């Protein structure tokens, strides 16, 4: 039988040095093309470090993306990230603006036939606004997403894999090799 799933992604926005200082200046918004949401974005124009950059989030490969820029909608009033309120619903409200506790959250629907496999790409980044659609369009091709993932893995392996140690404790080896050395 066919199954329909909702895939969610959530990111709390700081866009400054300290969230408690910067969140009042953050505005979230949606970017639409032909009345369809392409991505949710956020910007803090007063940030010395992030002022000209926009954080953005989208989910590629699903259907009917909905978004929210309100942490209280996603997590729930007094809620916790481990059990977000949004999981009780199949989509988000598309609320954005400067009056909310800022976040970028997105939901996309996925329909699966029996034994069917689908890949989705979550694109979450920060860039100048005019570059965002170019980045999203690049990763609409799943092969570009796979290549980027392999490049990131190679980068970190090359950077962190120069020294290898072997101890009697395998868990210590995992911790030391690549991260602490």
Segments and roles (model prediction):
Residues 2-90, 104-106, 132-162, 169:
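Polysaccharide-binding surfaces and accessory modules of carbohydrate-active proteins
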Residues 7, 100-102, 114-116:
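Solvent-exposed loop and beta-edge segments used for protein-protein assembly and interaction
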Residues 94-97, 107-112:
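Beta-strand-rich interaction surfaces with strong enrichment in secreted/lumenal proteins
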Residues 161-181:
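Extended glycan-interaction surfaces of carbohydrate-active proteins
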Residues 129-130, 176:
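Short amphipathic alpha-helical leader/targeting segments
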